[in-house]
Curated annotation (Swiss-Prot):
Record's function text: Specifically methylates the pseudouridine at position 1915 (m3Psi1915) in 23S rRNA.
SUPFAM superfamilies: alpha/beta knot (SSF75217)
Transmembrane segments: none
Catalytic activity: pseudouridine(1915) in 23S rRNA + S-adenosyl-L-methionine = N(3)-methylpseudouridine(1915) in 23S rRNA + S-adenosyl-L-homocysteine + H(+)
One of the Pfam families matching this protein, by short name: SPOUT_MTase
Organism: Helicobacter pylori (strain HPAG1)
Protein name: Ribosomal RNA large subunit methyltransferase H
Binding, S-adenosyl-L-methionine: A100, L118, S119, E120, M121, T122, F123
Subunit field text: Homodimer.
Length: 150
């Protein structure tokens, strides 16, 4: 299994994420983080919400894979507990997660993904990545009946 978390962010190594990456390997899952921040994104964010959202879509579109499960994190999307999250991931070998910048996703981009919400609360990219990586590890623990999830 391969899970890739794509985010509109400048690179920021997170020690806790590295721990979850290592733990996911025991379930034969490669957890990878890819930070994208094209030059046009900074300018687009200064112009308008619409320009910013378009720049996020353009950055993410090459990574949308029709053979993978594509999941966009969106505060107004479906949410559930860790068991529901694990069901969503189960039986998929390639899973792509997308975390937009401050202005969120364009509606057109969301149509190509399943949307999921970690919370109604707003998180920094760093916190969202840590929560997501922990939940991926927890989902794998549930799927493989590992005692971590209890």
């Amino acid at each position: 299994m391969r899970c890739v978390v794509y985010s509109i962010a400048k690179s920021s190594p997170l020690e806790l994420v590295k721990i979850y990456q290592k733990q996911c390997r025991q379930f034969d899952c490669e957890l990878e983080l890819v930070d994208l921040f094209p030059k046009n994104t900074a300018n687009a964010q200064k112009i308008s919400k619409e320009f910013a959202q378009k720049s996020y879509s353009l950055a993410f579109e090459p990574y949308l894979n029709p053979k993978a499960k594509n999941i966009a994190l969106h505060p107004k999307a479906q949410r559930g507990d860790s068991f529901a999250f694990s069901k969503m991931l189960e039986n998929h070998l390639n899973i792509n997660f997308f975390i937009a910048g401050a202005y969120g996703f364009e509606e057109n981009f969301l149509k190509g993904c399943q949307a999921w919400s970690l919370s109604e609360m707003t998180f920094s990219h760093e916190v969202a990545k840590i929560v997501l990586c922990e939940q991926i590890y927890r989902a794998l623990s549930i799927i493989f009946k590992h005692p971590y999830h209890k």
